[in-house]
């Protein structure tokens, strides 16, 4: 009899836990879109940001194409009736009272700028959506990739600049720097960030240039500068394109670091 009561109690607790898992999750920033799509079935996602429909995101998370999108407006938030809202800690102050008014649980997920912070973000979000086992599996896969990268570091440590024609170069302490370190390379900019025109970039003389594909195929002054003849000559065969995915700290960032390592190895040849 006692065993039957205990079993019934456990079943009731498990049923309550399953029912408590959020079923209408709304994401208000692209980086939580990506984590959310990794963690839960699309049927539990009420809305992701419109940025999840960008080509770079759809390449990695094609399931995002079937999910409604939002632009973070008050009207959309109220109309969605979410039971969990994923937001940025730096959300507009005017939105905070509105989020409280929905009655939904709000989880603020800070930007992840290194792999330790990625682990923390995954665990925070996985707990919020009731998918902690899935979260740990994502972390384990990421860590396995990072171990492989460390074991296969290039013989020579190349100096690299992330420069896409805009002039601003991310330095130490950011996500790109963490990706470079994982790939076995060194950031040319040792401050938090730098600004380089074509002449100063050539004077700095990094071994390779890394640039994003965000502006590929579009006309802009930034794109024109990127095609400067001096750069085309100096860095022929030493220009590495990365997907816009690298902008968010997510478990797939380890895969981006692998892509960087493979590309840098080709530069050395």
Segments predicted by a language model, with ranges:
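A short, structured surface patch at a secondary-structure boundary
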Residues: 24-80, 84-90, 188
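N-terminal signal peptide c-region/cleavage motif recognized by signal peptidases
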Residues: 13-17
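Extracytoplasmic ligand-binding site segments that recognize negatively charged/polar headgroups
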Residues: 94, 111-124, 159-175, 218
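Bacterial N-terminal signal peptides that target proteins for export
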Residues: 1-7
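Structured C-terminal subdomain patch of bacterial secreted/periplasmic proteins
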Residues: 23-24, 28, 116-127, 136, ...
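Boundary at the C-terminal end of the N-terminal hydrophobic targeting segment
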Residues: 18-22
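Alpha-helical, coiled-coil/dimerization segments enriched in small aliphatic residues
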Residues: 51-56, 63, 169-197
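Basic- and aromatic-lined ligand-binding clefts that recognize polyanionic substrates
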Residues: 23-40, 133-183
């Amino acid at each position: 009899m006692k065993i039957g009561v205990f079993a019934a109690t456990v079943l009731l607790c498990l049923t309550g836990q399953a029912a408590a898992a959020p079923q209408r999750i709304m994401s208000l920033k692209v980086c939580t879109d990506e984590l959310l799509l990794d963690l839960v079935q699309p049927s539990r996602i009420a809305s992701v940001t419109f940025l999840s429909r960008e080509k770079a995101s759809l390449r990695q998370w094609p399931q995002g194409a079937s999910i409604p999108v939002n632009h973070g407006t008050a009207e959309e938030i109220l109309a969605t009736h979410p039971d969990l809202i994923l937001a940025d800690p730096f959300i507009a102050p005017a939105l905070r009272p509105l989020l409280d008014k929905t009655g939904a649980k709000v989880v603020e997920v800070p930007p992840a700028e290194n792999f330790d912070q990625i682990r923390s973000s995954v665990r925070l979000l996985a707990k919020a959506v009731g998918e902690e086992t899935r979260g740990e599996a994502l972390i384990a896969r990421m860590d396995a990739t990072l171990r492989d990268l460390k074991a296969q570091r290039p013989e020579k440590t190349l100096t690299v600049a992330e420069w896409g024609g805009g002039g601003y170069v991310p330095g130490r302490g950011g996500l790109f720097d963490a990706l470079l370190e994982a790939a076995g390379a060194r950031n040319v900019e040792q401050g938090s960030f730098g600004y380089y025109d074509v002449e100063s970039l050539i004077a700095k003389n990094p071994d390779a240039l890394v640039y994003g594909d965000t502006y590929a195929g579009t006309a802009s002054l930034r794109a024109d500068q990127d095609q400067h003849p001096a750069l085309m000559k100096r860095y022929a065969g030493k220009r590495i394109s990365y997907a816009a995915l690298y902008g968010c700290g997510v478990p797939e960032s380890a895969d981006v670091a692998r892509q960087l390592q493979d590309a840098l190895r080709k530069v050395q040849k």
